């Protein structure tokens, strides 16, 4: 289904604000079979790849987040490689002895459950559409931005396979810093 979508168009490199050069353009199904709806009902979007002089490849046309993440798809939950990833990342996190963790984009809860099996931690997940909520985790339904925390602070902020989905990485990192105890 082709539908007009109000895309955000990058004019400069998201990392260093330099000019972008066209690489390629193609049409693609937005949800690519990651949801249960029929592929014929998928949204067809134009994917335009651009590159900066420094070699940073990025999408030029950005789908509005409320459309892109309207449904959860629990990526990163199936298979032994993902299970090992969450176990190893949990072991890494536990080494810093966290007490109050914010996980950004951890809708499936695998990382939280691995960490909570190892230590007593207050764990909060911010996720736009978490479907299977664990009772031992605090959930904030929405996209990450500092205003949703009402001045709450965390001693640790984690995210796994989330950064590549962030449209404004500088702003994202600044906002993470603002919710960390001591300002990061």
Predicted regions and their residues:
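A short His-aromatic
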Residues: 161-165
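Extended interfacial segments that mediate partner engagement and assembly in macromolecular machines
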Residues: 43-48, 55-129, 136, 141
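N-terminal juxtadomain amphipathic helix
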Residues: 2-81
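Local beta-strand N-terminus motif with an aromatic residue
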Residues: 98, 154-155
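Conserved short alpha-helix immediately C-terminal to the canonical SAM/SAH-binding motif I
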Residues: 130-132, 172
């Amino acid at each position: 289904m082709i539908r007009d979508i109000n895309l955000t168009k990058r004019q400069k490199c998201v990392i260093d604000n330099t000019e972008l050069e066209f690489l390629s353009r193609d049409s693609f199904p937005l949800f690519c079979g990651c949801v249960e709806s029929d592929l014929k009902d998928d949204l067809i979007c134009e994917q335009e790849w651009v590159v900066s002089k420094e070699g940073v490849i990025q999408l030029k046309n950005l789908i509005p987040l409320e459309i892109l993440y309207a449904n959860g798809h629990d990526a990163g939950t199936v298979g032994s490689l993902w299970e090992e990833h969450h176990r190893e990342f949990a072991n890494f996190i536990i080494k810093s002895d966290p007490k109050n963790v914010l996980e950004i984009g951890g809708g499936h809860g695998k990382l939280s459950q691995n960490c909570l099996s190892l230590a007593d931690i207050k764990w909060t997940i911010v996720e736009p559409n978490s479907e299977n909520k664990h009772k031992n985790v605090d959930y904030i339904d929405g996209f990450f931005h500092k205003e949703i925390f009402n001045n709450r602070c965390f001693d640790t902020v984690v995210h796994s396979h989330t950064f590549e989905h962030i449209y404004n990485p500088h702003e994202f990192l600044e906002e993470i810093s603002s919710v960390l105890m001591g300002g990061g």
